[in-house]
Amino acid sequence: VSSAIHLSLLIGPIVPIPVPALLIDALEEVSVTHASEGASGFQLRFKVNSHSELNTLFLIAVGNNTSLGTPPLRVVLIVTLGGRAQPLFDGVLTHVGVQAGQDRQAGSITLTGEDLSKVMDLIDFSGLPYPAMPIEARVALICAKYAAFGIIPLPIPALFPDVPIPIERIPAQQGTDLAYVRQLAEEVGHVFYIEPGEVPLTSIAYFGPEIKVGPPQPALNVDMDAHTNVESLNFSFDPTKGVLPVVYIQNPQTRAPIPIPIPNLNPLQPPLGALSAPIANLKMMKDTAKLNPMQAISAGLAEAKKSQDAVSASGSLDVLRYGRVLRARRLVGVRGAGVAYDGLYYVSSVTSTLARGKFTQSFQLTRNGLVSITPRVPA
């Protein structure tokens, strides 16, 4: 990519291997997106012509990925910045696009893929029972199937656990592993995603609440002359986003529904702003009356977490000027934006674009209030 940044590309089934120099020379652009919600993805664009050896290489590679008996083609991207190698993406190939060259101009082959959660979405396991297993145990058991891909499960118990009693009910899976795990996450207000680990060829399958605590990344500086390290940064505040969900728990004796307001109680999502967004309206969740109390409260927490982030920001930066790779699903500081918008933010998504001579990132930030709760943020 440049003299200060080195990109390594590994491709292969299950355990990928470094690609030949022919592929690296033909690689024009890399785009990688990590987001706090949904699957992450990548796109690789190669420059080719009709006589290029790359056509044969891709035919062989894709031909090995055409049935359930063969594993998906795995793609790993590793970035070395400042002498430190860190995995940028670990996923599988899902689509190959070819654009033919015209007027003596070279064509291109575009490889598109998703993170390793895609391998959990290939086979339907509907009907598989999980007797007497809490949700986090079910998630750990499901993720254990994919240890060959280097996936390490990290399930966090629900704030209000609901352990099924076998003589009353036995939970059964519906759909693929990925669909079922996401359904479980939705029920208890958790998120599920797979992201590259600290060591190449390993990934963390995280099932739990969004973590908005921990050491923040170096600050994004705006309008600070020589200390400015972002190309652009824009903010917005939506005062109507605050919603207080109200769940209904049925009294087993009288059958009368009891309304209970549910604030955002997640200890891993403390306020990042001193002035929280006002409660704009109430959301009556009447469907929760048919659930048991633990399930109803978990459904309320799931709804409460969606309506807290009234402050958002978007921007872009040059990685060489920033000095490191900005990571999604982490905290980051902001300086120079004014009293209302300075402070800590949660990085909800990052799109990294690499080409020869450049490495840029565009990002989205969120926060649940105005005015910083800390007098200083790490530089």
What do the PLM-derived regions correspond to, one by one?
Residues 1-120:
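Assembly/oligomerization scaffold segments
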Residues 97-113, 201, 353-366:
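Short, solvent-exposed secondary-structure boundary/capping segments
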Residues 14, 47-51, 80-82, 92-99, ...:
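Solvent-exposed coil/turn segments that connect beta secondary-structure elements
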Residues 120-141, 156-183, 317, 377:
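Short acidic/polar beta-strand-loop edge motifs in secreted extracellular
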Residues 111-126, 146-155:
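Residues forming anionic-ligand binding surfaces in small-molecule and nucleic-acid pockets
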Residues 29, 87-92, 110, 127, ...:
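Well-ordered beta-strand positions in beta-sheet-rich domains
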